[in-house]
Amino acid sequence: MVSIPLILGAIILLGTRKAATAALPPRPCAFAVTAATDDTCQSLGAQWGIGMAQFLKWNPGVNCNALVAGKTYCLSAGDSELGPTASLTPSPQVPTTSRATQTMTSKASTGTLVSRSGPIKFLNGMAPDCLFYHPVSPGDTCQSIVDRYKAFTLDQFYTWNPSVGKNCESLWLGYYVCTGVKGGPNSPSQQPPSQQPPSQQSPSQQSPSQQSPSQQPPSQQPPSQQPPSQQSNTSQQTQPNVNSKCKFHIFCLGTLAYMAFD
């Protein structure tokens, strides 16, 4: 017959072991994502290929009926059977730096990871006056993006994208980063001014000083009209016996007739 003290001791020991197990802190999260407004435990698990049991294990105490938008949720812990070579297909936050690639997957630099489905994602804290963007692709680094555009410095890139970190440790695949701000090195205001076409006015609309000699029309002035005093005397030099003081031939004829009559 088992004694009562032995039974009590076994119960106390079992309860102590359970309490010790529950008191163990969770292992560090190796990979986490930020929940969007419409995300749920089921949607995150489906998008990342994570089972509900694993999701609940890595996020103890989570309320799947009300995920908090903007809060991070763990998708891979240090004790995960996924391990460092796991291939999670959606990758909104898989960094492309060598450190992050080793942490999450060895395939990040080969281009096998694709962007997470959904709307375009931008890094937090991006410059509010950003006009130009670049989608982070596999193999990208902050310096390679600067070298690609050759229109801004690395310090400017860090200023426009503070979320990437001081050493570009948080450059996430599938996210857009700012590569130009309003009034910046490669903004439209810095483009050379457009060259307006030459004037399309016809020669008749241009002033004479603007027209070339070949374009100026020939003079259209009417022939000069000399006053009567300067006209030739051919009309006055008529037939003989015409009065030299006569101005009109008909009157001269009349005068001659009158003189002849007189």
From Swiss-Prot:
Compartments, as annotated in UniProt: Secreted
Low complexity: compositionally biased ranges: 197-214, 227-240
UniProt feature, compositional bias: Polar residues: 86-112
CDD domains (alphabetical): LysM
Keywords: Chitin-binding, Glycoprotein, Repeat, Secreted, Signal, Virulence
Claim: Protease is one of the keywords in the record: no
Cystine pairings recorded for this chain: none
Record-linked PROSITE patterns: LYSM
Stretches assigned to the LysM domain: 31-75, 132-179
InterPro entries: LysM1-like, LysM_dom, LysM_dom_sf
Residues glycosylated per entry: N233
Annotated stretches, region: Disordered: 85-112, 184-240
Signal sequence bounds: 1-22
Any one annotated GO CC term: extracellular region
Superkingdom per UniProt: Eukaryota
Ranges of compositional bias, category Pro residues: 215-226
Molecular function as annotated in GO: chitin binding
Chain's role: Might have a role in sequestration of chitin oligosaccharides (breakdown products of fungal cell walls that are released during invasion and act as triggers of host immunity) to dampen host defense.
Entry's free-text remark on domains: The LysM domains bind chitin and potentially related carbohydrates, and might be involved in damping host defense.
Name this protein carries in UniProt: LysM domain-containing protein ARB_03438
